Amino acid sequence: HYPSTITSNDLDLLHKDYRQYLGNICHSIPFFISLGNHEGENDYYLNQNPPNNLAIWGTYWRKYYYPNPSPNSFYSGNTDYEPYGIGNPENYYAWTWGDALFVVLDVYRYQNINSDKPQNWDWSLGIKQYTWLRNTLENSTAKYKFVFAHHIRGQGRGAITNAKLFEWGGFEADGKTYSFDKNR
């Protein structure tokens, strides 16, 4: 993404392009989005020249073409409403089906910004999403629990390697220094 040059029309066209591929499978199976870096709905874009920015347009067009669940009698999730026509961002949610709990997280929308682009401890689920996740897991009686996230945190691949770092596991980049209490 080029946040300073992308337009609402660009994002509309991008989502329309996905439809040809998703249409081949979504007529017979459900489709749930776990938001990631390519949707552009990152917190550090939200406040850049609103309402004309990548995050707001990305959220608007994603919701228009591919709405995610929002809280009701079946789904739980984010109950916030955001300005600029976004409304409920439909960015994290959960549901139980049979004896399985499905939880979808957003590791991009909430950061503790200390730089132009979040690094390490800047990436966060945010306290509201974290509290919701904790309550959802603790209160579930489902035998099976599945948690989905695009990346384990807002940046970086390598799940098992990164799982113990920063907000998720509490360790610094060296993998030896525990500092969750200091940073959270």
Give names to the regions the model predicted:
Residues 1-184:
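Metal-dependent phosphoester/phosphodiester hydrolase catalytic core
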